[in-house]
Swiss-Prot record:
Keywords: Cell shape, Cell wall biogenesis/degradation, Isomerase, Peptidoglycan synthesis. This is Glutamate racemase. The gene is murI. NCBIfam families: glut_race. One of its GO terms (molecular function) is glutamate racemase activity. PROSITE patterns: ASP_GLU_RACEMASE_1, ASP_GLU_RACEMASE_2. It comes from Pasteurella multocida (strain Pm70). GO terms for biological process: cell wall organization; peptidoglycan biosynthetic process; regulation of cell shape. Coiled coil: none annotated.
Length: 269
C-alpha cells in the first residue's frame, strides 16, 4: 500500500449481515475509507436465481465505482460469493474478496468430528460448498441447515428490535438433540451478529466459527500489494437500494457502526 492516501473499500451484501465482516476489517485497518452497500430492495439473495444475483451485484458495484473509485471490493455475503466472484473479477481490475464458509477451521477444531453448517438455503445447496466439505471435512459428519428466518431475525436486531428467541429456537430445533455436535460454522455473515442468541439455543456446541477475521487479514495482505488509486478524504458512507419505514432509527444504527450518511441508490437510473 505505497500511497499517502487511504484505500476505498466497498463491502457489499443483500442485507446488513456484512457488518460482521466490516467490523473485523475496520478493527484491523481503522483508517481506510469504507463504503457499505446493502441491496435491501432485493433482499434476501437466498431466494433469488444465480443469474439475478450476478447481474444485480455487478450493476450496483459498477454504479458505486463510477462515483467513488474503488480499490478493493468485499462481497460480504456467503450466498453471493458462491456465484458472483468470476463476473466481478472479470470486470474489475481491483481485488475482489469473497466470503467462504469456514469449513476447514471448523473441521480442524472439532473434537467430536461432528460439525454443523448454518447458512442460507442458497448457500447450503451450492456445489461449491459440497466441494469445500469434500476437501476439508471428509473425516467429519456435517449437518447442514439452511435458514432464511435467521437472516430476518439478525436484520431485525440491527434495526433495534428484540430478538425473538422462541422463533430462533424453533429454527434451530433440528440440531438441539444432536449431543455430539460440538462445532458450528456460521456460514452467513448475518449469523455472527446473533451468535450469543444462537449459543443459547445450542448449549452443547463448544465452537462457533466464521470467516470475519480471515477476510480482514486477506484484505490487509491484498492492500499491501497494490497502488492505491482513489485519492479521497471522504467520510464513510452506507448505501441502500430503497428507503424503509424506520429510517430515523436506522440513522442511529449507521452512526454506531461508523458511517456518516445513508444514501439511496437509484438503480432505475
Amino acid at each position: 500500500m505505497n500511497s499517502p492516501y487511504q484505500p476505498t473499500i466497498l463491502f457489499f451484501d443483500s442485507g446488513m449481515g456484512g457488518f460482521s465482516v466490516y467490523k473485523e476489517t475496520k478493527q484491523l485497518l481503522p483508517d481506510c475509507h469504507y463504503l457499505y452497500c446493502f441491496d435491501n430492495a432485493f433482499f434476501p439473495y437466498s431466494e433469488k436465481s444465480e443469474e439475478e444475483i450476478i447481474q444485480r451485484t455487478l450493476k450496483i458495484c459498477q454504479k458505486i465505482d463510477r462515483t467513488f473509485p474503488l480499490d478493493l471490493i468485499v462481497i460480504a455475503c456467503n450466498t453471493a460469493s458462491t456465484v458472483v466472484l468470476p463476473a466481478l473479477r472479470a470486470h474489475f481490475a481491483i481485488p475482489v474478496v469473497g466470503t467462504v464458509p469456514a469449513i476447514k477451521p471448523a473441521a480442524e477444531c472439532s473434537e467430536t468430528k461432528h460439525i454443523g453448517l448454518l447458512a442460507t438455503k442458497g448457500t447450503v445447496k451450492r456445489a461449491y460448498v459440497a466441494d469445500l466439505i469434500a476437501q476439508y471435512a471428509r473425516d467429519c459428519t456435517v449437518e447442514k441447515l439452511g435458514s432464511t428466518k435467521l437472516v430476518e431475525i439478525a436484520e431485525q436486531k440491527l434495526h433495534g428490535k428484540a430478538v425473538d428467541l422462541h422463533a430462533l429456537k424453533q429454527e434451530l430445533a433440528p440440531w438441539q438433540s444432536i449431543q455430539n455436535l460440538d462445532t458450528v460454522v456460521l456460514g452467513c455473515t448475518h449469523f455472527p451478529l446473533i451468535k450469543e442468541e444462537i449459543k443459547w439455543c445450542l448449549p452443547q456446541v463448544r465452537f462457533f466459527v466464521d470467516s470475519g477475521k480471515a477476510i480482514a487479514l486477506r484484505v490487509k495482505t491484498l492492500l499491501s500489494k497494490i497502488d492505491i488509486q482513489s485519492k479521497t478524504n471522504e467520510k464513510n458512507l452506507i448505501f441502500c437500494t430503497q428507503f424503509f419505514e424506520d429510517e430515523t432509527q436506522f440513522q442511529k444504527v449507521i452512526h454506531f457502526w461508523g458511517f456518516e450518511q445513508l444514501i439511496n441508490l437509484n438503480m432505475k437510473a
